Amino acid sequence: MADGMYHEKQYLMHCAVHTLNNLFQEPWATAALMEDIAKELFDREAAMREESGMGRMWVNPYKSLVPQVGYYDINVLLEALKLKACHVSLHAVFNPKEPHAVSTAFEGFNAKPGTGVRGIVINRVSKSLLGGLYTSHHFYAIIPSTKTIWYVVDSKNPGPEIIGTTSELALHLGMEARENQGHVFVVSDGEGDV
């Protein structure tokens, strides 16, 4: 475990909140913030649907049906990143035709100080319920130390866990994409779109 590293533990389905706080190493994101962002996204989409003559949405797809429970959509997390002047600079996902593409893409990954890379967010399948009819997803952060050693900072774990060097990071990301249908989001400073 990494001494002095900020680490939030899982509460309800707030893994997106914990991931943001673990990524930025401070407790700035809250369930109230994420609820507000989810409502704003819902209102924007409802207005666009109304303008285009599409039917009304009755349920907010950006969060849990139950208020304050969490289970926030990736779009809520992406909007929250903007509040910290950050964006996703790379998004990688498993491709069965190229099973090692994610690992290969990250083999020469450079996240040394000065590159603007804050860390990585993983969104992976967490549970498959009802015989695979329903799956839930879980977010967690991966952050570099000042010595370019990478750590998993997952709210479901008792504390931060070391991954190792960039080559070990590439293997970890490839495994997450391959085995857990993980989406890999590289978070960088500044504005931009993937």
Segments from the language model and where they lie:
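Conserved beta-strand elements of beta-rich interaction domains across eukaryotes
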Residues: L12, L20-N22, N95, V125-K127, ...
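Amphipathic alpha-helical interface elements that mediate macromolecular binding in regulatory proteins
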Residues: M13, V17-N21, N75, E79, ...
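Conserved active-site-adjacent core of cysteine acyl-enzyme catalytic domains
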Residues: E50-G132, S145
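Canonical SH2 domain fold
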Residues: L129-S145, W150-S155
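Noncatalytic regulatory segments and standalone regulatory/sensor domains
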Residues: I149-V194
